[in-house]
Amino acid sequence: MGCRSFLTPYVDPETGKPKYYGRFNQGVVTINLVDVALSSGGNFEKFWKIFDERLALCHKALQARHQRLMGTPSDAAPILWQYGALARLKKGEKIDKLLFGGYSTISLGYAGLYECVKYMTGKSHTDAGAKPFALSVMQHMNDKCTEWKKAENMDYSLYGTPLESTTYKFAKCLQKRFGIVPGITDKNYITNSYHVHVSEHIDAFTKLKFESEFQKLSPGGAISYVEVPNMQDNLEAVISVLQFIYDNIMYAELNTKSDYCQCCGYDLSLIHISEPTRLALI
């Protein structure tokens, strides 16, 4: 399971009780929403058509991941499948039954909602005029997961992909296919999942409240972040943000700048000033 994966509810048929430990994810395939938007040329009718084509391709790739696991004997990894890390199967028993019925999840990931909406509407998804389109994109992916789940008895769910190195890979592929599109492909990254773009001026509480609406539509996993300055001497503010997270959003965390000077041992925040060889302390 990834760092932001959510386990969907599963009731053990033998005990009739919910079970969370020992479960796992079969894999993730991520759709590049920015590519879908750029491929449509800004035409909404084409967008939805291409969107469905790309989702079908993702579905095919997810099925390939699933088929790769089918037939795996428990002997392939005894600690996982026989000794209780994930299951307690018999020697030689196949893991197939764990791939169906919701015991394990399989995830449709997504990336670049901000750039997708920006290209299609000319506005950020934080804008009231563009937000409905952003939510409709999220809902459409959820609907597809529900459709696949009913047809195959596998727990497909929508997942806010961490991206990490993939953000650079996606960005470079977009630049190669579409060139530099101002505000869309002019950076060597695309925005993670539903996140507010890093360039937007927005306070922590507004950001968390806004993103909570999208996190609800990402039941396979998601996380929101807010960046704060050094807060060692302002713990009340930290607690107020944490309380807001607790009250408004499922999963979020604070990022804070942490610097360390190897000469004097200063360990708060350092910023560059006009002279490039000097640092200022804050």
How would you label these PLM feature ranges?
Residues 1-111, 115-119, 228-230, 238-262:
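Structured mid-domain segments that build the active-site/substrate or prosthetic-cofactor binding neighborhood
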Residues 262-263, 275:
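Short, cysteine/histidine-rich loop/knuckle motifs that typically chelate Zn2+
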Residues 271-275, 279-282:
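Single conserved hydrophobic/aromatic residue that forms the stacking wall/gate
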Residues 265-269:
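Cys/His-rich microdomains that often coordinate metals
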Residues 150-192:
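Extended amphipathic alpha-helical segments with heptad-repeat/coiled-coil character used for oligomerization
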